[in-house]
Amino acid sequence: TYNLKKIHTGIIFQTIIGILVIALLVLGYTFILQRNYNNSALDESVARNKQCADAIHKHMSDKFVREDFDSISSIDDIGLPRYKKLQKQLNELRALNSTRYLYTVKKTDDGKLIYLVDGLDLDADDYAYPGTLIEKEMVTYIEQALSGKVVYSNKIVDTTWGHIFTACYPVEASDGTGDIIGALCMEMDMESTYACMEADNHRAFMISIIAIVVFAILANIVYIYLRKQKYIKIQQREELEKAVSA
């Protein structure tokens, strides 16, 4: 009886350890595969958006003058001919490239970042009038652009208005001074990419759980089989010992 209990405990311990090891291996392998797949999908989406953003910037880079950033600062300026012209250009370009948002930005004398020309339709619910404060999620990217750097978000940016890719470009004055007079920014929708990645993560998690359950069932079957074999061997040995002692 003592031997049976000892063997029984040993088999249980080995089975539990085996299940844990297999579970960790399955989870680890699934995590690595899923991470690599997600990174690949994200890199492809970001590269595609970068290419689109660069094309927009190339088209617009030589169309700005200092006046576009100095003379526009409030809602009162939407009637200016220059504002109307730029707004029309950005609106057409945004629609052509399926870009979600396309706009110009500047920093005011008191250090605030504000919208200037928004490329959305004028009757859009989220159209930003000149002078509207920039959302905090975009501040870091715009600040870098205003320092002279071209900035891309190399990941999905989670904002209050959705999951996006953003690119910001410094706008230099065309008068030869080299002054950074503002920034041209654009945002591409990443909602579909984010949804696919989340769905894939959930699917991978469920597959891992199913695999672990299957391994646990198989391990239990093996445990029962081994326990039975051990019991048979002990019974045979005890019968042999009895026969010898008789």
PLM regions with names:
Residues 119-157:
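Extracytoplasmic/periplasmic sensor domains and loops in membrane signaling proteins
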